[in-house]
C-alpha cells in the first residue's frame, strides 16, 4: 500500500459539502413536518414521504449503473467526482424548486416528487463524494477522511436546527406545534434559502481550483450479470412493498381510522367510557392481523436483499466476467453491511422515542434531549475518528482521542440545553463516551479491527438495552449512536479497497444500500407491535452480529488480494 500524501487543500474544500448536507437536513426537519400538517396527511401519506427519500438513493444509484452498463464506462468516473457533485447539487436545487411550487399550490404529489428529486441529487453527490475522499490520499487511511466528512456533516446537523429555529421563531426551543403554526410564506422562504444553498455550493465546487477533477475515462467491462441481479432484486422489492402501502388504504385500515375518529368525538363525555372501550377492542382486533401481514411483507423485502446479494456473491465467485464491481466479494458483502448498518442506526433512533414513552413514561418534550444525544453521539464518534485524517504526532493523536470526544459530548449537551431541554439526566452518559474512547485505542486506527470492536460494542449495547430496565437500558440504547458513528467510513473504505477503475461503480452500489433505512426500522416497528417495544431491539443485535462477521471476513479477503489495511 502506498503512502500517498493527503491533498489537504482539496480535502477542506470537499468537506464543505458534508457540512451543508447536515445543515440542509435541518431545513427538512422543519419543512417536512410542516408539510405533513399543511397537507393533512394520513398515516399512509406520511410513510410515503419517508420512503420516497430513502428509495430515491436506491433508484439514483441504480440509474447511474444502468447508464454505465449501456455506455461501457462509469458516468461518475467519466464526469469526474468534482463535476458529479456539482450536477447532484443542481439536481437537488431543481427538486427544492419543485417542492416550493407544490406547497404553494397545495399539490401533495408534486411535493413528494420534488423531495424524490432532492434525494436523487443527494444520491449522485454521495456516490461521488465518498470515493473522492478516499482518492485524496493513501487508500488505507480513506476511512479517516470519510470520518472527517461525517464529523463535519454531524456538526451541520447539530447546529442547523438551532440556526433555523432562531431565524424562523427567534428562539432555539421549538415544538411541533410551533412548526405547524408557521406561516406558509416563512416556510417557502426557508426552502428558497435551501435551494439557493444548493446553487451556492455548486458554484463553490465548480469554480474551485483546489479540487482535482477526479476523472477516470478508462473503459470498464460490461456488467450485464450484475444489472440483471439488481433488476430482479428491485422487481421483487416492488412486489413486497406494494402490499404494505396498499394496506394503508384497505378496508380494515379505513375501519380503524373511522373508529379512531369516533373515539375522539366520544372522549369528552365520561358517560361514553364503555363505548370507547368497545371501540378500542375492535381496533385491536382489526389492527393485529393487519400489522402481521405488513411484517410478513417487510420481512420478505429484507430476505430479497439478503438472499439476492448472497446469490450474486456465489455466482460472481464462480465466473467474475460480466459482474463489474460486483466481481469483488468485499464489495457485495459491504453492500449488505451498509444496508444493515443504515438500517440499525435509523431503527434504534426511530424506535427510541417509543421505548422512552412506554417504558420510562416520558412525554414528547422529555424525550427530545435523549433523541438529541443519540444523534449527537454520531458526531462524538466521527470527530474522534477524524483526528487521524491529519498528519499529527502520535502523542498528540493519543491526547486528542481522549479530549475531542469529551469536548464533543459537552457541545452536544450545551446545544441541547440551549434548545431549552433539561440535560441533568444525561451527565452520567460520559461513561459510555469513555468506553468508546477505549474502543478507539483498541482499534489502533485500523478500519477492519475498529469495525469489529465497535460492532461487538453495539451488540453488547443492544443486548443490555433489551434485557435490563431503567436508565441503564436507556444509556445502552443511546450508546448505539456512539458505536455506529465510525461504521460508514470503515465499511466504505474496506468495501472499495482494490476496486481500481470500478471504485465509482462500487460506490454507487453501496449508496443503493441506504435502502436499509426504509426496511429495517418499520420492520422493528411492526415487531414491537407484536412482542413489545423493548424485546424488538433484538433486531439491532442481529444486525451487529453480521457487522462483526463482516469485519472479520473482509480483512482476510483483502489480505488474500495483497491489500494491507492494517
Where are each of the predicted segments found?
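Extracytoplasmic
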Residues: 9-41, 61-64, 160, 348-356
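Extracytoplasmic gate region of multi-pass secondary transporters
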Residues: 28-32, 236-285, 324-381, 414-416
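C-terminal ends and interior cores of transmembrane alpha-helices
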Residues: 90-105, 409-423, 440-444, 457-469
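Intracellular juxtamembrane helix-capping segments at the cytosolic ends
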Residues: 124-138, 349-352, 485-500
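Glycine-rich segments within core transmembrane alpha-helices of 12-TM secondary carriers
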Residues: 141-172, 198, 506-521
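C-terminal membrane-cytosol helix-exit motif in multi-pass small-molecule transporters
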Residues: 164-173, 192-219, 226-252, 296-316, ...
Amino acid at each position: 500500500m502506498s503512502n500517498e500524501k493527503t491533498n489537504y487543500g482539496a480535502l477542506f474544500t470537499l468537506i464543505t459539502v458534508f457540512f451543508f448536507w447536515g445543515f440542509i437536513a435541518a431545513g427538512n426537519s422543519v419543512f417536512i413536518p410542516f408539510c405533513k400538517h399543511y397537507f393533512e396527511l394520513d398515516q399512509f401519506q406520511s410513510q410515503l414521504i419517508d420512503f420516497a427519500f430513502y428509495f430515491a438513493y436506491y433508484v439514483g444509484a441504480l440509474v447511474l449503473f444502468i447508464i454505465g452498463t449501456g455506455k461501457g464506462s462509469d458516468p461518475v468516473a467519466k464526469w469526474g467526482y468534482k463535476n458529479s457533485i456539482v450536477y447532484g447539487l443542481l439536481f437537488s436545487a431543481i427538486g427544492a424548486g419543485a417542492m416550493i411550487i407544490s406547497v404553494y399550490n397545495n399539490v401533495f404529489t408534486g411535493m413528494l416528487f420534488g423531495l424524490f428529486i432532492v434525494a436523487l441529487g443527494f444520491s449522485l453527490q454521495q456516490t461521488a463524494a465518498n470515493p473522492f475522499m478516499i482518492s485524496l490520499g493513501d487508500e488505507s487511511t480513506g476511512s479517516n477522511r470519510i470520518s472527517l466528512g461525517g464529523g463535519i456533516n454531524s456538526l451541520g446537523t447539530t447546529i442547523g436546527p438551532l440556526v433555523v429555529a432562531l431565524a424562523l421563531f427567534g428562539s432555539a426551543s421549538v415544538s411541533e406545534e410551533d412548526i405547524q403554526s408557521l406561516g406558509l410564506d416563512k416556510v417557502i422562504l426557508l426552502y428558497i434559502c435551501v435551494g439557493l444553498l444548493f446553487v451556492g455550493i455548486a458554484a463553490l465546487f465548480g469554480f474551485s481550483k483546489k479540487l482535482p477533477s477526479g476523472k477516470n475515462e478508462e473503459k470498464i467491462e460490461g456488467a450485464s450479470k450484475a444489472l440483471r441481479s439488481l433488476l430482479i432484486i428491485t422487481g421483487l422489492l416492488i412486489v413486497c412493498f406494494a402490499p404494505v402501502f396498499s394496506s394503508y388504504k384497505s378496508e380494515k385500515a379505513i375501519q380503524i381510522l373511522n373508529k379512531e375518529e369516533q373515539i375522539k368525538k366520544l372522549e369528552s363525555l365520561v358517560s361514553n367510557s364503555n363505548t370507547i372501550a368497545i371501540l378500542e377492542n375492535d381496533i385491536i382486533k382489526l389492527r393485529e392481523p393487519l400489522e402481521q401481514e405488513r411484517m410478513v411483507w417487510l420481512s420478505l423485502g429484507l430476505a430479497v436483499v439478503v438472499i439476492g446479494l448472497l446469490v450474486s456473491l456465489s455466482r460472481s465467485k464462480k465466473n467474475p466476467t460480466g459482474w463489474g464491481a460486483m466481481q469483488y466479494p468485499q464489495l457485495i458483502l459491504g453492500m449488505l453491511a451498509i444496508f444493515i448498518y443504515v438500517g440499525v442506526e435509523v431503527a434504534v433512533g426511530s424506535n427510541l422515542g417509543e421505548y422512552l414513552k412506554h417504558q420510562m413514561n416520558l412525554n414528547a418534550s422529555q424525550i427530545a434531549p435523549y433523541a438529541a444525544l443519540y444523534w449527537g453521539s454520531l458526531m462524538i464518534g466521527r470527530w474522534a475518528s477524524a483526528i487521524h485524517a491529519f498528519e499529527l504526532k502520535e502523542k498528540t493523536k493519543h491526547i486528542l482521542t481522549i479530549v475531542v470526544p469529551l469536548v464533543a459530548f459537552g457541545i452536544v449537551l450545551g446545544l441541547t440545553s440551549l434548545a431549552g431541554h433539561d440535560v441533568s439526566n444525561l451527565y452520567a452518559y460520559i461513561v459510555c463516551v469513555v468506553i468508546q474512547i477505549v474502543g478507539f485505542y483498541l482499534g489502533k486506527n485500523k478500519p477492519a479491527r475498529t469495525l469489529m470492536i465497535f460492532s461487538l460494542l453495539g451488540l453488547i449495547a443492544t443486548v443490555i438495552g433489551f434485557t435490563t430496565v431503567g436508565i441503564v437500558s436507556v444509556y445502552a440504547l443511546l450508546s448505539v449512536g456512539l458505536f455506529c458513528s465510525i461504521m460508514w467510513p470503515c465499511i466504505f473504505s474496506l468495501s472499495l479497497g482494490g476496486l481500481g477503475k470500478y471504485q465509482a461503480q462500487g460506490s454507487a452500489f453501496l449508496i443503493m444500500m441506504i435502502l436499509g433505512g426504509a426496511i429495517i426500522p418499520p420492520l422493528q416497528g411492526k415487531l414491537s407491535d407484536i412482542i413489545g417495544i423493548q424485546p424488538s431491539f433484538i433486531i439491532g443485535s442481529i444486525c451487529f452480529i453480521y457487522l462483526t462477521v463482516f469485519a472479520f471476513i473482509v480483512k482476510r479477503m483483502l489480505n488474500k488480494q495483497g491489500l494491507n489495511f492494517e
